[in-house]
Structure formats: structure tokens, C-alpha cells
């Protein structure tokens, strides 16, 4: 059929880096980093290795290093909300205005509440930090409303944001 499939070694590197990126153990994150570098050199077209390296560097607090990989991923997956969310996460510590823009772009890329709850809450957090409480409340309410309608648990971040004094005082904007 003419398709190329990744080698077993490439799949192993990809899965190991994905699992490591979920860890909060700095020793494990630092341990796998040279292996990911080797894998990226060996398989430069594998965007998932670049994604996992960006996540690893972000978990290690190396946001400036993560940015280059995050940009590569976002350029490759420009229409995927999660790529913009990753870029927002990378930018959040040093450039919160850019993070806000990335989260907005993520929601423009996908309006499906099934997938966008986390990014909506991150956007609400940034909006609240800027004093845009009505918009922040609107985002939190949308997440809560969707979760309740689906019979799902309300995320801790939504509960935390909804318990803030600004939330009680704000009137939700109908659209952001």
C-alpha cells in the first residue's frame, strides 16, 4: 500500500518518552532525555518524539528549551487544539499573554467540549489573572455544564476556580 511504518526501535523510543513525560520524577525525566535526543536524531520526521521532548523539558521547568520543540509540533499540527494548548503551557510561566493567545487558538481549533475542558480551565485562569472575570466565569461554567450534562465528575480546577471570590461576583459572559 506504499505506507511507511515506524520501526520497532522508533516505537519503543516514542512510548518510553511518552510514559516518561507523564512522570513527575526529575531523575527519570533527566535519564530518558539523552535517549530521546538520540531518537530524534535518528528519526527526525517523528513529530511525536518532538512532542514528548517538549513535554519532558516542560516538566523539568526548562520552558525556553521546550519552546523550540513546542513550536515544531504546533507548526506540524496547526489545526489540532492540543498543539496550541502545549504551546500555551510552555509560554504560561514567562509570557502569560502569549499563553492566553495560544489557549484561545486552541479553542478556535476545536469547539468540542468533550476534549477542551482542560484548555478552557487554563484559559479561565489566565483571564482571571487579567481581571476578565466575566469571561473566565463563562469558561468555567461551560466546563461544569458539559460535565454535569454528561454525568461526569467536575474537575478539581473547575471547582477551585468556582470557589474564588471573583467567580461569585462576576456575571458570565455569553460568548468569548
Predicted regions and their residues:
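Helix-turn-helix repeat elements of alpha-solenoid scaffolds
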Residues: 1, 20-34, 55-65, 92-101
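Amphipathic alpha-helical repeat scaffolds of TPR domains
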Residues: 1-23, 42-55, 79-89, 117-125, ...
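Extended, charge- and Ser/Thr-rich helical segments
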Residues: 2-12, 33, 39-41, 55-72
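Tetratricopeptide repeat
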Residues: 30-33, 40, 67, 74, ...
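Short coil turns that delineate tetratricopeptide repeat
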Residues: 44, 77-78, 111-114, 148
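Extended, charged alpha-helical interaction scaffolds
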Residues: 67, 77-86, 100-103
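TPR/TPR-like (Sel1-like) alpha-helical repeat modules
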Residues: 103-109, 127-152
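Charged, low-complexity interaction regions that mediate assembly/partner binding
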Residues: 146-176
Amino acid at each position: 500500500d506504499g505506507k511507511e511504518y515506524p520501526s520497532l526501535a522508533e516505537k519503543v523510543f516514542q512510548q518510553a518518552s511518552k510514559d516518561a513525560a507523564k512522570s513527575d520524577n526529575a531523575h527519570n525525566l533527566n535519564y530518558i532525555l539523552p535517549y530521546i535526543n538520540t531518537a530524534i536524531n535518528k528519526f527526525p520526521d517523528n513529530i511525536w518524539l518532538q512532542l514528548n521532548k517538549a513535554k519532558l523539558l516542560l516538566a523539568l521547568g526548562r520552558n525556553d528549551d521546550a519552546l523550540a520543540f513546542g513550536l515544531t509540533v504546533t507548526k506540524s499540527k496547526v489545526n489540532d487544539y492540543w498543539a496550541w494548548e502545549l504551546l500555551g503551557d510552555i509560554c504560561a510561566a514567562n509570557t502569560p499573554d502569549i499563553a492566553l493567545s495560544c489557549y484561545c487558538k486552541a479553542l478556535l481549533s476545536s469547539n468540542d467540549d468533550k476534549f477542551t475542558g482542560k484548555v478552557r480551565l487554563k484559559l479561565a485562569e489566565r483571564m482571571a489573572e487579567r481581571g476578565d472575570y466575566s469571561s473566565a466565569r463563562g469558561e468555567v461554567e461551560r466546563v461544569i455544564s458539559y460535565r454535569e450534562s454528561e454525568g461526569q465528575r467536575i474537575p478539581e480546577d473547575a471547582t477551585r476556580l468556582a470557589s474564588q471570590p471573583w467567580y461569585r461576583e462576576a456575571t458570565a459572559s455569553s460568548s468569548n
